[in-house]
C-alpha cells in the first residue's frame, strides 16, 4: 500500500477555515490555528444567539404592546387578559406591529378588550 501524502487535504481544510474567517481582524483572518479557534467561537455565538434572538424579540414585542396599552389606560397584563377573554387570536408579534404602525387599529382592539373585561 503506497504512502498517502496529506498536502492536498490539509490545504483544503486550511482553505475552508480561512474562508470562514474572512473579514476577521488581525491574525484571526490569516493564521490557521488562530482562525480555527475564532471560527469555532463564532459558531458557538451563532448557536447561542439563534436561541436568544427569539427571546429578545418576544421581550421587544411585550415592551411595545405595554407602551401602547399604557397610552390607552391599560397595563400589559390586563390587556393580554382582556385579549383572551374577548377571544381575539392575535399573537404578540402582530399586536406589537399594530401598536407601532397602525395605532387606530390597536385602539379598536383595545376598545374590544375593555368591552370584554367589562362583561
UniProtKB/Swiss-Prot annotation:
It comes from the Bacteria. Keywords: Ribonucleoprotein, Ribosomal protein, RNA-binding, rRNA-binding. This is Large ribosomal subunit protein bL20. Binds directly to 23S ribosomal RNA and is necessary for the in vitro assembly process of the 50S ribosomal subunit. It is not involved in the protein synthesizing functions of that subunit. Belongs to the bacterial ribosomal protein bL20 family. One of its GO terms (molecular function) is structural constituent of ribosome. NCBIfam families: rplT_bact.
